[in-house]
């Protein structure tokens, strides 16, 4: 079980459009970071690369759902013999 240093709303993070990464200041002087892709995949833990602290990111997962669509199953019911 992870012990979070803090829980922080995504709105409090700084967003870098070039790297598609969210940053939040860490007490050690570096930044916690989490990518947009991580959020789209349901991740909610931002890490600091300079120390062992982690924070829980509070965000609406529905807003970060990946835009991928899954095709409907085929309705072709023809069976193929092996």
Curated annotation (Swiss-Prot):
Residues 4-60 form the DPH-type MB domain. One of its GO terms (cellular component) is nucleus. One of its GO terms (molecular function) is ferrous iron binding. Fe cation binds at residues 26, 28, 48, 51. Its cofactor is Fe(2+). Pfam families: Zn_ribbon_CSL (PF05207). One of its GO terms (biological process) is tRNA wobble base 5-methoxycarbonylmethyl-2-thiouridinylation. It comes from the Eukaryota. It catalyses: [3Fe-4S](1+)-[protein] + Fe(2+)-[Dph3] = [3Fe-4S](0)-[protein] + Fe(3+)-[Dph3]; 2 [3Fe-4S](0)-[protein] + 2 Fe(2+)-[Dph3] + NADH = 2 [4Fe-4S](1+)-[protein] + 2 [Dph3] + NAD(+) + H(+). Required for the first step of diphthamide biosynthesis, a post-translational modification of histidine which occurs in elongation factor 2. DPH1 and DPH2 transfer a 3-amino-3-carboxypropyl (ACP) group from S-adenosyl-L-methionine (SAM) to a histidine residue, the reaction is assisted by a reduction system comprising DPH3 and a NADH-dependent reductase. Acts as an electron donor to reduce the Fe-S cluster in DPH1-DPH2 keeping the [4Fe-4S] clusters in the active and reduced state. The DPH-type metal-binding (MB) domain can also bind zinc. However, iron is the physiological binding partner as zinc binding impairs the protein electron donor function. This is Diphthamide biosynthesis protein 3. It comes from Cricetulus griseus.
